[in-house]
């Protein structure tokens, strides 16, 4: 789960991380009133969307008067902001964060992530802050600093000292950086975060370190422990089909293709998407119904797939282990009769009760195309939509 910048800063401040502060606006009629509450020489108006690249896309504006800030805020509120992360459709700006500006002497990058390849928490830092860190890693990888934390021992003093040293901090600034490292680590662990990113972390004119922008992504599997964080969820920033799927206990990610996929198991789902590409089409979604899906969940999964107007055909690929193939077959038939599937539907079943499942499908009287293996299924669905 993602949250907005102003929410991320609120959490970080609770853990002792110094951040820039401001006021959030959620209604156009509150813009002037909110800006009047800020007494500053420089105003920073920031669009609040769940995507990076806001600055380059015009979603962050620095102005030097109240009237100019009000005009910029009114112009920005409600627009569709297109960044390199939103896609061409953009993301509607429903919230603004208005801050007091500050002098910046130097910008840094600092983040903490769970590194799945190394099976540990990793700090990533760079003296090149305020820019796309992926570009820095590609062009000047020597400027990327990494410190891994052994899960058996946790954060140690040498991690904090090392990060401060590698970033070139000394004396009081080194002490500040060590405290920030510790605070961010504690926030990461205690909130079940998947990533905390501060970009940029700045040194201001007073020589103090300050988080000027912040992003936090949470592990969805840990949200049940944090109702206060779950309450921060902004459904307007999420795909409505993905929200609907999550409420039904389904793992669904919308994609840009034309073949809808319903599969059980994340690995099998990715293999199914790969083979669809191999045979010349593109997957419209990732959808894992899980190992314990029942008839109603299968029915809802197909409804969600068909809610995507770009879907021209559906490939169902089920390996029946915990999931019985006859249950899948009954769900497919129920959905087909209920909503009327008007696109080609290819079904490949294997595993528990496969013969019974295939018999149910063949006796249904519906135009369901059976497949014997994954390659056969991919070939048939691609041919069916041509």
Curated annotation (Swiss-Prot):
Cofactor comment: Binds 1 Mg(2+) ion per subunit.
Binding-site residues for Mg(2+), renumbered to this chain: 199, 213
Domain ATP-grasp: 9-244
Keyword field contains Nucleotide-binding: yes
The reaction(s) this protein catalyses: succinate + ATP + CoA = succinyl-CoA + ADP + phosphate; GTP + succinate + CoA = succinyl-CoA + GDP + phosphate
Superkingdom of origin: Bacteria
Keywords: ATP-binding, Ligase, Magnesium, Metal-binding, Nucleotide-binding, Tricarboxylic acid cycle
A molecular function GO annotation: magnesium ion binding
GO biological process: succinyl-CoA metabolic process; tricarboxylic acid cycle
Known EC number: 6.2.1.5
Gene3D superfamilies, per the entry: ATP-grasp fold, A domain, ATP-grasp fold, B domain, Succinyl-CoA synthetase domains
Pathway given in the UniProt record: Carbohydrate metabolism; tricarboxylic acid cycle; succinate from succinyl-CoA (ligase route): step 1/1
Keyword Ligase (UniProt): yes
A Pfam family of this chain: ATP-grasp_2
Residues the entry annotates as binding ATP: 46, 53-55, 99, 102, 107
Cofactors required: Mg(2+)
Cellular component, GO, one term: succinate-CoA ligase complex
Protein residues bound to substrate: 264, 321-323
Main enzyme class: ligase
Function text: Succinyl-CoA synthetase functions in the citric acid cycle (TCA), coupling the hydrolysis of succinyl-CoA to the synthesis of either ATP or GTP and thus represents the only step of substrate-level phosphorylation in the TCA. The beta subunit provides nucleotide specificity of the enzyme and binds the substrate succinate, while the binding sites for coenzyme A and phosphate are found in the alpha subunit.
Self-association and partners: Heterotetramer of two alpha and two beta subunits.
UniProt xrefs under PANTHER family: SUCCINATE--COA LIGASE [GDP-FORMING] SUBUNIT BETA, MITOCHONDRIAL, SUCCINYL-COA SYNTHETASE BETA CHAIN
UniProt family annotation: Belongs to the succinate/malate CoA ligase beta subunit family.
Protein name, as recorded: Succinate--CoA ligase [ADP-forming] subunit beta
Origin species: Rickettsia africae (strain ESF-5)
Taxonomic classification: Bacteria, Pseudomonadati, Pseudomonadota, Alphaproteobacteria, Rickettsiales
Gene that specifies this protein: sucC
């Amino acid at each position: 789960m993602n949250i907005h910048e102003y929410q991320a800063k609120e959490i970080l401040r609770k853990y002792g991380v110094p951040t820039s502060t401001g006021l959030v606006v959620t209604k156009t009629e509150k813009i002037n009133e909110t800006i009047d509450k800020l007494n500053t020489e420089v105003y920073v108006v920031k669009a609040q969307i769940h995507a990076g690249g806001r600055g380059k896309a015009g979603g962050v504006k620095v102005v030097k008067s109240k009237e100019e800030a009000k005009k910029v805020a009114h112009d920005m509120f409600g627009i569709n902001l297109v960044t390199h992360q939103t896609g061409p459709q953009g993301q509607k700006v429903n919230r603004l964060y208005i801050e007091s500006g500050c002098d910046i002497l130097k910008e840094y990058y600092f983040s903490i992530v769970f590194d799945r390849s190394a099976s540990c928490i990793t700090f990533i830092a760079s003296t090149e802050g305020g820019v796309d860190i992926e570009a820095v890693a590609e062009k000047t990888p020597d400027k990327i600093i990494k410190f891994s934390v052994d899960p058996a021992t946790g954060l140690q003093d040498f991690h904090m000292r090392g990060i401060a040293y590698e970033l070139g901090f000394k004396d009081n600034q080194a002490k500040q950086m060590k405290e920030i490292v510790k605070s961010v680590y504690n926030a990461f662990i205690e909130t079940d975060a998947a990533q905390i990113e501060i970009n940029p972390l700045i040194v201001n004119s007073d020589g103090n370190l300050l988080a000027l922008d912040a992003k936090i992504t949470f592990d969805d599997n840990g949200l049940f422990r944090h109702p206060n964080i779950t309450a921060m969820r902004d459904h307007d920033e999420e795909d409505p089909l993905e929200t609907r799927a999550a409420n039904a206990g389904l793992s669904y990610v919308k994609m840009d293709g034309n073949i809808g996929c319903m599969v059980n198991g994340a690995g099998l789902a990715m293999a199914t998407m790969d083979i669809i590409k191999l045979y010349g089409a593109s997957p419209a979604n990732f959808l894992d119904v899980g190992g314990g899906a029942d008839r109603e969940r299968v029915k809802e999964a197909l409804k969600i797939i068909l809610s995507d107007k770009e879907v021209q055909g559906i490939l169902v690929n089920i390996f029946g282990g915990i999931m019985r193939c006859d249950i899948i077959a009954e769900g497919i038939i129920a959905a087909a009769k209920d909503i009327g599937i008007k696109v080609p539907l290819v079904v490949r079943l294997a595993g528990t009760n496969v013969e019974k499942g295939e018999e149910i499908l063949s006796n249904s009287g519906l135009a369901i195309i059976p497949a014997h293996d994954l390659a056969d299924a991919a070939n048939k669905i691609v041919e069916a939509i041509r």
